[in-house]
UniProtKB/Swiss-Prot annotation:
Residues 54-70 are annotated as: Framework-2. Residues 39-52 have a biased composition (Polar residues). Residues 110-118 are annotated as: Complementarity-determining-3. Residues 20-118 form the Ig-like domain. Its main location: secreted. This is Immunoglobulin lambda variable 2-18. Residues 20-44 are annotated as: Framework-1.
Length: 118
């Protein structure tokens, strides 16, 4: 049975020159149990390309967001190692290997700088 991992982009406007920045995610990604999926988060050379402070959050329906990855590729304690993060150029990615039913959720990327969060 296939099920979708639904994605939304977390956008929190900053201030000054950062106020117009935004991160772009695909509208949805789907996979079947056991498969691997990669979710992209694309910015620009001024944000994602310049900072290693990309985080990923998982939000199952009706629950609060949970931090899954911070600083591009670091996993907090308790997050399974089948979740991994990476970055190439202006695009950060979250890869989920060996999909499980409980992985069905919204996934958000976020970028933190010293003055702004996107």
């Amino acid at each position: 049975m296939a099920w979708a991992l639904l994605l939304l982009t977390l956008l929190t406007q900053g201030t000054g020159s950062w106020a117009q920045s935004a991160l772009t995610q695909p509208p949805s990604v789907s996979g079947s149990p056991g498969q691997s999926v990669t979710i992209s988060c694309t910015g620009t050379s001024s944000d994602v390309g310049s900072y290693n402070r990309v985080s990923w959050y998982q939000q199952p329906p009706g629950t609060a967001p949970k931090l899954m990855i911070y600083e591009v590729s670091n996993r907090p304690s308790g997050v399974p190692d089948r979740f991994s993060g990476s970055k190439s150029g202006n695009t950060a990615s979250l890869t989920i290997s060996g999909l499980q039913a409980e992985d069905e959720a919204d996934y958000y990327c976020s970028l933190y700088t010293s003055s702004s969060t996107f």
